[in-house]
């Protein structure tokens, strides 16, 4: 069974890390930094081609932030475009951002299935 395991770090570069696990196997990791009233997705890496695992990691991180009173999110992770595209982040002022309720809303099949 797939589980998105949170690990609170509270360091300068990472507030929480989420690991996608299937039993003992790690399928991916997402790092979140809460700062300046923003939930910042700073890193995403997958050990699988299944982009839905990455989407689940993003949703777990954004839900974590929302439960702590954060409303806006930015995506600063490098080399994670395919995963980022699973949620409707928009480019504004040179960065990818969105309000968490909109990012967590359903996609109604508008996901690139590649």
Regions found by a protein language model. Name each.
Residues 9-11, 23, 32-35, 64-66:
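Sterically constrained small-residue positions within well-ordered secondary structures
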Residues 65-78:
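Conserved GNAT acetyl-CoA-binding A-motif
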Residues 92-114:
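C-terminal "cap" of GNAT-fold acetyltransferases
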Residues 78-95:
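Conserved active-site alpha-helix within GNAT-family acetyltransferase domains
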Residues 1-21, 106-114:
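Short amphipathic alpha-helix that is part of the acyltransferase structural core
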Residues 49-66:
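Conserved acetyl-CoA-binding loop-helix of GNAT-fold acetyltransferases
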Residues 16-53:
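Conserved donor-binding loop and adjoining core beta-sheet/short helix segment
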Residues 31-33, 73, 88-89:
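Short, exposed beta-strand/loop patches in secreted or surface proteins that constitute
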């Amino acid at each position: 069974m797939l589980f998105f395991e949170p690990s609170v770090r509270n360091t300068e570069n990472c507030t929480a890390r989420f690991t996608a696990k299937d039993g003992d196997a790690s399928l991916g990791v997402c790092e979140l930094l809460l700062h300046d009233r923003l939930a910042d997705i700073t890193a995403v890496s997958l050990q699988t081609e299944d982009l839905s695992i990455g989407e689940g990691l993003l949703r777990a991180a954004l839900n974590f932030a929302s439960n702590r009173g954060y409303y806006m999110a930015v995506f600063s992770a490098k080399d994670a475009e395919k995963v980022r595209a699973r949620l409707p982040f928009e480019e504004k002022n040179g960065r990818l951002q969105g309000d968490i309720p909109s990012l967590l809303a359903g996609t109604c099949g508008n996901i690139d299935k590649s």
